[in-house]
A protein has these predicted regions:
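Mature, structured extracellular domains of secreted fungal proteins
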Residues: 20-181
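Fungal secretory targeting signals
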Residues: 1-25
Length: 181
């Protein structure tokens, strides 16, 4: 009886520990999405502010550096989502809602980067459009991996909605990549 009691005590402690770890991981994923939201907004604002002509190399490199930071954040967030495992219903809904909220900003940034291509091409450094193309490709890869991890861990009833968001966002990169290719 004493051994059985110890077993249940150990099992209870392990269960509580696991629940706390999963809770922390979900909190980390939510924090990652908040950081991604801030970085996407910063990137979109920098692209919007870049003029069609007469822009500066410093402003163009700021856009590049912001994109590079976003790629790093997306890669870290992908690792966090993967290590968290399947999300519960409430957390899955919260995460999906957060991603849906930044979708218009992502789409706006990708539309504007195409519109601003003449401004980047007019700068005295010839390789800038190629640098932007590389950033776009890397952003698409990182975004796709993050979205794939989210879909894989979404509750079953949210998978289709998550896939729709994933498809919309990753497909939005194609016209931008084509414009700079």
């Amino acid at each position: 009886m004493v051994q059985l009691s110890r077993f249940f005590t150990v099992l209870s402690v392990a269960t509580v520990s696991l629940a706390l770890i999963v809770g922390r991981d979900v909190a980390k994923v939510k924090a990652d999405i908040a950081t991604i939201t801030t970085q996407v907004t910063t990137l979109d604002n920098a692209i919007q502010a870049f003029p069609l002509s007469g822009g500066s190399l410093l402003n163009a490199l700021t856009i590049h550096n912001t994109a590079t930071g976003l790629i790093t954040t997306l890669n870290g967030a992908t690792t966090d989502v993967t290590s968290t495992g399947p999300l519960g219903e409430a957390d899955g809904r919260a995460v999906l809602t957060s991603v849906e909220a930044i979708q218009p900003v992502i789409l706006d940034a990708l539309t504007n980067i195409v519109v601003k291509k003449p401004g980047f091409a007019s700068l005295p450094i010839g390789g800038l459009p190629a640098l932007i193309l590389q950033d776009l490709k890397n952003l698409k890869t990182a975004t796709s991996a993050f979205a794939t991890a989210l879909v894989a861990n979404a509750p079953a009833d949210l998978v289709e909605e998550a896939k729709t968001v994933q498809t919309t966002i990753t497909n939005a990169f194609d016209p931008a990549i084509a414009a700079y290719s």
